[in-house]
Amino acid sequence: MSAKSFEVTDPVNSSLKGFALANPSITLVPEEKILFRKTDSDKIALISGGGSGHEPTHAGFIGKGMLSGAVVGEIFASPSTKQILNAIRLVNENASGVLLIVKNYTGDVLHFGLSAERARALGINCRVAVIGDDVAVGREKGGMVGRRALAGTVLVHKIVGAFAEEYSSKYGLDGTAKVAKIINDNLVTIGSSLDHCKVPGRKFESELNEKQMELGMGIHNEPGVKVLDPIPSTEDLISKYMLPKLLDPNDKDRAFVKFDEDDEVVLLVNNLGGVSNFVISSITSKTTDFLKENYNITPVQTIAGTLMTSFNGNGFSITLLNATKATKALQSDFEEIKSVLDLLNAFTNAPGWPIADFEKTSAPSVNDDLLHNEVTAKAVGTYDFDKFAEWMKSGAEQVIKSEPHITELDNQVGDGDCGYTLVAGVKGITENLDKLSKDSLSQAVAQISDFIEGSMGGTSGGLYSILLSGFSHGLIQVCKSKDEPVTKEIVAKSLGIALDTLYKYTKARKGSSTMIDALEPFVKEFTASKDFNKAVKAAEEGAKSTATFEAKFGRASYVGDSSQVEDPGAVGLCEFLKGVQSAL
């Protein structure tokens, strides 16, 4: 692939501004990277989002009959909880509830999940639907992480959007969320790419040579299921490698959806960004031929185009939706639904939908009163602020001191940024100590949750932010009055609530080779003994045990064996706790 590319300054904001200029019925809130449209007050609004670089996903599918809004982060990075919560506020102003349709990537799930929790705490009717349709990472490798999200997500946007437009006033948020699950349960997708994409502002890098390509490469340049060497013909790629991964009923690792002989099937061929329309049309034709010849499947509807990209990714994906099984599942709960195809083909004016009809509507105005950037919590639990500040400083100093070691570990099992991310997190605490509530621990912890998310970003920021948000909520539940002093017993109970809250948004558990392997033993030991020293020792033992585990979560779960190396996230947490311990 050529390393040449068009580069602009501030590419994400420039792209959003250009999109809004070309689509005047959609409003852009530049400082929040939010785009939204008008929504009827008796209907459920849909919001999606994630990292930039997949256009027209997500903003391109804002329109009547599809999404009500989208919120995006930087390139390949989840938007923050603040952004998402503000998007919820804006869209909910003229809706009866909000469904967040989230691609199954850890950072997205954590940040959108935390936003939904905070929205519900504000009295907003809000739920999350997590979508995953990829078959490249099968059940064995995907484990508890689940399937990655690919272009099939757009079919969820379209079908659920049509349902929300027509029926959500009757069936509400729960009914709309159920439709999303039904469609996701009947979707399978696999992608292939000749090379990595070129990310704006970064040097092009690839492990593939001119004679290699990758089967199952993800939309963020993640590894696929197999490197093909030499590159097969396009016909062989489709017939011998891609379709069997979607349709082989004997492949128990990937047979996520059953296709019977008489089932109606929708075919979506998606351009990952760098393939010409001419070639995509040819690929669509060949795919249809092989479906008929090898599987006796004649798609009842075929969609081809550029729906979910990876910048200029020189590849494509194939998605199959079992329309028959989806229709039957829908009909069991929604008597009005005659066919899922009616929802798929219902009117939309979303600019990115390839078979849309367009109608001009005026853009909504921004209600600035709904945009908030301060996190607040019910004020309970008095505490010694000066001691607390010293503990935080000592913990931060220990993490900063240990950063080279943490980075060395992460270079072996991850992407090498864990140490830097943790340092950014602890600096986010120490640099904002003067802003913390000195009268209420619940409010102070909620503020720290916000500072950490803003300074760390990514998956780690989401995990720690949710954990601390849960701890704040635990203090609110356990403390009997605003002025009750926080004791070890209160902290212990609140930590248990915090851990339970975190477990709502990650499937990682002890034994998964993550920071949970240090966190859970710490919480359990402190809950049992109320002894911080014993709890730190339990955390250290948990971190050491990760050297014997295979990673099941995060980027390390997609690469090779990581045995004999302690998980850097677990080690980083222990270093912080040891720093606090030294200041007690």
From Swiss-Prot:
One Gene Ontology molecular-function label: triokinase activity
Functional description taken from the UniProt entry: Catalyzes both the phosphorylation of dihydroxyacetone and of glyceraldehyde.
Biological processes per GO annotation: anaerobic glycerol catabolic process; glycerol catabolic process; glycerol to glycerone phosphate metabolic process
Gene field: DAK1
PTM-bearing positions, type N-acetylserine: 2
The EC number(s) this enzyme carries: 2.7.1.28, 2.7.1.29
Enzyme's top EC category: transferase
The name this protein goes by in its record: Dihydroxyacetone kinase 1
UniProt catalytic activity: dihydroxyacetone + ATP = dihydroxyacetone phosphate + ADP + H(+); D-glyceraldehyde + ATP = D-glyceraldehyde 3-phosphate + ADP + H(+)
One of the record's GO cellular component terms: cytoplasm
